């Protein structure tokens, strides 16, 4: 990105040579993403992130029936709530893999149902890119959402796949960028950073590393949590057909998730209690409430996220600290334990 700021500083829409150089860099990233998801480059536009991409699709269907799942990101749930109506065709918006529990939704079945009725299907693929192979044509999607920071790129950059012929209404108007589909000056350094991350995915076939090394680490931690910590349970179904290989969400009876997070953070172990977009909200995770229906389970849950940079030593470090932390919290908890 530093190189891009120095070499591709010009407005990419300009006709002069520096502008052409900047646009070439943008198109390079577009082609990389298209190749990784089996799309045509002209079907992809760049945005400021997944939330903008999600809102763009849903606003296209303002006043129409919009059907989503309770597991969706807030940018889908809240936009759909504000903009849905009763007009047809219907938009179905279902993520492929949930960001809090990692589990897959039956996207192909939903797409088939949508298209049989002349409706449209959008999917937030943000969490899945780079973790598993993706093919928007095989998934039969009309729209798909991506975000650079989920693959090691910069924050503030995303992309939206729009199938040829699918309805589209720009969220931002006032410029001819992206063939009049998003009017604003290009964030060339950010898009270049996204491109560098995508090239890394392609060159290293990261989905293969996630399917082997990362899955092994995740499953080992899951096994040890259940074996060594009384009152623990998993909110993530394990298995290649069930969930992403890098996410593990677990609950610990009579231990508050935020307290677990703070104790682990003091030990240099970074976990989360839900979506980062909802951090600071004392309400239980809407995802875990939808899955379990139990506020105590939701409040006592934490999410572990693995990457190829992790090792079995990291699993050992977690298990050297976590049982003692849970035991300490359970002893001072006012919540009665169901298991002893």
Residue ranges and their predicted role:
Residues 1-340:
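Pyridoxal 5′-phosphate
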């Amino acid at each position: 990105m530093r190189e891009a700021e120095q070499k591709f500083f010009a407005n990419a829409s300009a006709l002069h040579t520096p502008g052409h150089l900047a646009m070439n860099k943008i198109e390079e990233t577009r082609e990389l993403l298209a190749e990784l998801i089996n799309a045509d480059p002209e079907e992809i536009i760049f945005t400021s992130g997944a939330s903008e991409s999600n809102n763009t699709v849903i606003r296209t269907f303002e006043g129409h029936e919009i059907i989503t799942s309770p597991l969706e990101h807030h940018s889908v749930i809240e936009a759909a709530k504000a903009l849905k109506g009763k007009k047809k065709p219907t938009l179905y918006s279902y993520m492929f893999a949930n960001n809090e529990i990692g589990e897959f939704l039956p996207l192909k079945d939903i797409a088939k149902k949508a298209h049989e009725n002349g409706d449209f299907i959008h999917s937030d693929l943000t969490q899945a890119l780079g973790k598993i192979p993706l093919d928007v044509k095989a998934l039969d999607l009309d729209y798909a959402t991506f975000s650079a920071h989920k693959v090691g790129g910069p924050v503030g950059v995303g992309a939206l796949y729009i199938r040829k012929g699918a309805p589209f209404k720009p969220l931002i108007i006032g410029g001819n960028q992206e063939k009049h589909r998003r009017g604003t000056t290009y964030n060339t350094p950010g898009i270049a950073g996204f491109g560098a991350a995508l090239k890394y995915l392609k060159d290293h076939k990261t989905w293969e590393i996630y399917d082997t090394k990362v899955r092994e680490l995740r499953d080992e931690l899951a096994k040890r949590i259940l074996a060594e910590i009384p009152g623990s349970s998993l909110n993530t179904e394990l298995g290649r057909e069930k969930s992403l290989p890098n996410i593990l969400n677990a609950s610990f009876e009579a231990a508050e998730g935020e307290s677990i997070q703070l104790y682990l953070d003091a030990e240099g172990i970074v976990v989360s209690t839900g979506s980062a977009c909802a951090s600071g909200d004392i309400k239980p995770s809407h995802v875990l409430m939808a899955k379990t229906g139990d506020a105590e389970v939701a409040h006592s849950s934490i999410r572990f996220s693995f990457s190829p940079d992790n090792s079995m030593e990291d699993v050992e470090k977690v298990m050297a600290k976590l049982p003692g932390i849970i035991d300490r919290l359970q002893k001072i908890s006012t919540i009665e334990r169901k298991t002893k």
